[in-house]
Amino acid sequence: MVMAMGFDTVVAAIMATAIIVAVAYTFLAGSTSIAELSVESYKDAVNSAVKKLRSDIEILSVSYDNSTSKIVAYFKNTGDERYPDFSEFDAIVYGRTSGGEMVSFYVNSTVFSITNELINPGIFDPQEVAKLEAVQPLQNGTYVLLICTPNAVCDSADFSV
């Protein structure tokens, strides 16, 4: 009988050890997953910050034609980032009319085109110049055109109507 009692104790000890190892493995696997997720999130944040640091544009000129209500602006990609299309670029006009009224417009009817294509047709590469055309009726006054890249890097230029 002593023999059976000892064997039961050994089996119970083995089972308890197996349960403890399984629970420890579960906690370890969960901790590893959380650590991996944290590292990936940190990498994404760093990559986003690096893209912002590498992005820059400069508005070269802005003009407004009263007869067609068209804003025409030329801007240059002075950063190191490449943009495959202009679908996520934003154009905003704000300013003061000659009557003193403050106005602002998110310009929806914009047409972008690359005017100084150097390499990679259809991609807005560094050092290339693009043209923005937008139809926006404006009263006489002074305005600011703000152009923003998808990375939220913006440049602005003043113009008068």
Curated annotation (Swiss-Prot):
Organism for this UniProt entry: Archaeoglobus fulgidus (strain ATCC 49558 / DSM 4304 / JCM 9628 / NBRC 100126 / VC-16)
Signal peptide: 1-35
MF GO annotations: structural molecule activity
Xref: Pfam families: Arch_flagellin
Listed InterPro entries: Flagellin_arc (IPR002774)
Entry's Gene Ontology BP terms: archaeal or bacterial-type flagellum-dependent cell motility
Keyword Signal annotated: yes
Keywords (A to Z) from UniProt: Signal
Designated name of the protein: Uncharacterized protein AF_1051
Domain of life of the organism encoding this protein: Archaea
